[in-house]
Regions:
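A surface-exposed, charged beta-strand/loop segment in the N-terminal or early-internal portion
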Residues: 48-120
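Active-site helix-to-loop segments that bind/position phosphate- or nucleotide-bearing substrates
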Residues: 1-20, 27-29, 35, 87-228, ...
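Terminal-proximal segments
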Residues: 1-72, 82
Length: 341
């Protein structure tokens, strides 16, 4: 089990990372802003264009500290990792399964978990806020998601599965405006938009999914899997397809719940966004800092894992699933148990 230490988030776009002996040093315009012993850091997420010194990159690589770079708006650019953990036999088996008919079984499990967890969030929200939502719409979407779960298990190929997943996602998005209980004008949701996000809700979702993808990619590589070879998401240069597969299980449970909690508690407001002339919307520097501060706290919340029945900190969940996936690929488990609440 990977120990959860601390992830260092650099939110200002003029920060520069360097190294002084055993310390990670943050500089701004040549002035030292802060320093941290590398032993207490397990990951660095940088939203800066300035980058990092070769000595800092070497320190991270030698000590398995994941270092990822994002644009100030949160779009993932790239990452540095040290020597690959795990053994070549695991990856060879992963590649065989990804190219074989069995890949559909893994893909089905990722998507079944995605739809199931979306449905569970819907039902929980309906239970807690019955007086403030369109219960008829919720029941209608619940029926559609239940049907989609049945169809996922009957899908015979990835194209069929892709169609079912897309229909289920569209149904789920129909109720997003009902998830907003505070400042509905600012947080009006008009459908999922990416690159760029075109409203405040999409800006929050995209930022959260980017962070979650980083966590999932780190988890997969920590157990020795190739995060770029997936089962549901097809291979594409530069795309961490297996990380995106794993993200599907956690979208609703980790990111969606968190985003609507921020909105409904008034922890993120209109002033935390930047509205561009082309219609795109991004979190401001202050908005990113608020999001990340609360995200970091959320990571330490404990939940009971549905398969192991043990208490697990929230952001250790991708590591547990990565371990279970590796066991399934090795043949130590009869099948992969996805994260389903």
């Amino acid at each position: 089990m990977k120990k959860l230490l601390n992830t260092l988030y650099l939110t200002q776009d003029n920060f520069y990372l360097t190294r002084e002996r055993d310390n990670i040093v943050i500089k701004q315009e040549g002035k030292v802003i802060n320093r941290f012993p590398y032993r207490i850091i397990d990951g660095i997420v940088c939203f800066s264009y300035l980058g990092a010194s070769p000595s800092l990159i070497e320190l991270c690589a030698e000590n398995q500290i994941n270092l990822s770079f994002h644009t100030p708006q949160g779009r993932f650019c790239g990452r540095f990792v040290g020597a690959t953990n795990g053994n070549v036999l695991l990856r060879r088996q992963q590649y065989r399964l990804a190219d074989a008919e069995m890949s559909i079984e893994y893909a089905q499990r990722f998507i079944l978990a995605k739809i199931s967890n979306s449905r569970k969030y819907l039902l929980r929200f309906k239970r807690d806020h019955r007086e403030r939502i369109d219960t008829h719409l919720f029941e209608e979407v619940n029926t559609e998601l239940t049907w989609a779960m049945e169809q996922v298990q009957l899908a015979e190929d990835k194209n069929s599965l892709l169609g079912i997943e897309g229909q289920a996602a569209n149904q789920y998005f129909r109720i997003f405006n009902d998830f907003v209980l505070n400042d509905k004008e600012t947080f009006q949701f008009n459908g999922r938009t990416r690159r760029p996000p075109l409203d405040c809700v999409n800006a929050l979702l995209s930022f959260g999914y980017s962070l979650l993808t980083y966590e999932c990619q780190s988890a997969l590589e920590a157990v020795g899997l190739d995060s770029y070879v997936g089962f549901f998401h097809t291979d594409r240069p530069g795309r961490a397809s297996l990380a995106l597969d794993l993200v599907e299980e956690f979208r609703a449970f980790i990111v969606d719940r968190f985003v609507f909690s921020l909105i409904n508690k008034g922890q993120i407001t209109k002033k935390d966004f930047e509205f561009k002339e082309n219609g795109s919307v991004f979190l401001s520097e202050k908005g990113r800092a608020t999001f990340l501060e609360l995200w970091q706290k959320r990571k330490h919340m404990e939940v009971e894992h549905p398969y192991t029945k043990e208490k697990v900190k929230m952001m250790l969940l991708p590591y547990v699933q990565a371990q279970l996936l590796a066991k399934a690929i090795r043949g130590e488990l009869e099948s992969y148990p996805p994260f389903m609440i």
